[in-house]
Amino acid sequence: MKIINIGVLAHVDAGKTTLTESLLYNSGAITELGSVDKGTTRTDNTLLERQRGITIQTGITSFQWENTKVNIIDTPGHMDFLAEVYRSLSVLDGAILLISAKDGVQAQTRILFHALRKMGIPTIFFINKIDQNGIDLSTVYQDIKEKLSAEIVIKQKVELYPNVCVTNFTESEQWDTVIEGNDDLLEKYMSGKSLEALELEQEESIRFQNCSLFPLYHGSAKSNIGIDNLIEVITNKFYSSTHRGPSELCGNVFKIEYTKKRQRLAYIRLYSGVLHLRDSVRVSEKEKIKVTEMYTSINGELCKIDRAYSGEIVILQNEFLKLNSVLGDTKLLPQRKKIENPHPLLQTTVEPSKPEQREMLLDALLEISDSDPLLRYYVDSTTHEIILSFLGKVQMEVISALLQEKYHVEIELKEPTVIYMERPLKNAEYTIHIEVPPNPFWASIGLSVSPLPLGSGMQYESSVSLGYLNQSFQNAVMEGIRYGCEQGLYGWNVTDCKICFKYGLYYSPVSTPADFRMLAPIVLEQVLKKAGTELLEPYLSFKIYAPQEYLSRAYNDAPKYCANIVDTQLKNNEVILSGEIPARCIQEYRSDLTFFTNGRSVCLTELKGYHVTTGEPVCQPRRPNSRIDKVRYMFNKIT
């Protein structure tokens, strides 16, 4: 049986969850349509998703049509959940990008299409809600050509009045884009030679798989218009990106989920081989796990299975698998261009509204951060505050609602702040000797630090011979330095520097790796005090698309948000602004753009790097360590 995995992507309220329901219903996978309004859909299964009518976590379901099984990935549509989208994209064989006939191409549509193009995923456009009043499809087509791609093939003729009717083209007009994109076909056509339908279909298929051409279909998921035809298109146009014939096992973990009973589930896309119940499988070329329970989606329901084949999405109950873990042979994993998840750039303090629920909150955050790499947390040992780092405002609203709905914990949040970093200002060296007070450890360590250009990261090397200081001691020094780099002089992570282990001494009978591990961060702090550090703040590169009439407003507002515009282009009555902006300003700048353009602007951002800040440094409380803080205090007192 052929197995394909497709994604359903769209801007908020374009109808992707409703489309999923219609595909399941028309294929016979379910006998009754779910409703977004009533909260009975198969994929939006959390209370918050049902209340807001939006998808937040990736939903997975399936249907079978003739000899093809189709796994549907119903992905989120809001910017703050793009991490969920990106993780899901890597397992797709193809995508359906929904566009509302009423709303046209929205900001989020462009962001999603940008990601699909970057990942090289074959994509079909589906114009949804064509039965609504006041639809002008020619305007929608032009919108798609200007904002997404001009390389579209309109596959159907649509009559909106008196009744909506969609029929597949049989005339030559659907082949214009295909012919124009191939010099040989165009020359043949211009010379008056006949073109066979087969060669046109082959050319279309090649360009579709190469993501240089996009078939376009129409319908209404809610009114069940064009859905049967879309099912045929899905099963015939998309190919499975799996290894043919016998091969070793290879699968990739793309989602972690916890059930209401706190069972931990790992979602895995299989790319080759066969996975059997009770198999022992190597994970990321390291430890092995035993498959004790295995599920997959069959006609919209999760069912236990005893084997799964290449192309399938399986769900294992396992406590150790991590996101992006590879089961089996890592060399068989498809080489697809990777989109980096955005980095958490904000942090805040969270506490339970009821102090007695603190342990419940920590347990809940452990589960949530396990399934969402964009949420991280730690507990400040001095203040006992719980510090969260995250991406955006809506993400925090969702986490707050999730804690209340699933874990029954209400929380209070402080105003978020940006996450900074530190870099040494100059070269410096420092040595702490064994048996010289106040050093209580049976170790001597000498370190040097040198600043590096921005974006270099932290580099470490040892000039101490392994013949003199064995590997276990050397590893302990490196571990201690990495720990020390987590908190610089202002309490932020230390980066863009080279740290060299230059001198070490031990006493054979009594010295242990723990002595070196404990002393290393103390030496590092002292050498950083000699060097001094400067504060770095995150900057984002941005590209803004806005209607041309808003050029002056967008340009003039930029300095107010510390944005630096480096390039301006005019294209199709649209202005494209490129530049960079501090991460602390992007949320407000983006919100204002959306407001004064009435939602007609889109702002694409990615982390550019860190720049030196000006003004007073922002400090963060250090996380204490009971084993070394007393020694730190003594050294700080004498230096």
Curated annotation (Swiss-Prot):
The keyword Protein biosynthesis applies. Residues 1-242 form the tr-type G domain. The keyword Zinc does not apply. It holds the Pfam family EF-G_D2. Keywords: Antibiotic resistance, GTP-binding, Nucleotide-binding, Protein biosynthesis, Transposable element. PROSITE patterns: G_TR_1, G_TR_2. GO terms for molecular function: GTP binding; GTPase activity. It comes from the Bacteria. Abolishes the inhibitory effect of tetracyclin on protein synthesis by a non-covalent modification of the ribosomes. Belongs to the TRAFAC class translation factor GTPase superfamily. Classic translation factor GTPase family. TetM/TetO subfamily. PANTHER family: RIBOSOME-RELEASING FACTOR 2, MITOCHONDRIAL, TRANSLATION ELONGATION FACTOR G-RELATED. This is Tetracycline resistance protein TetM from transposon TnFO1. The gene is tetM.
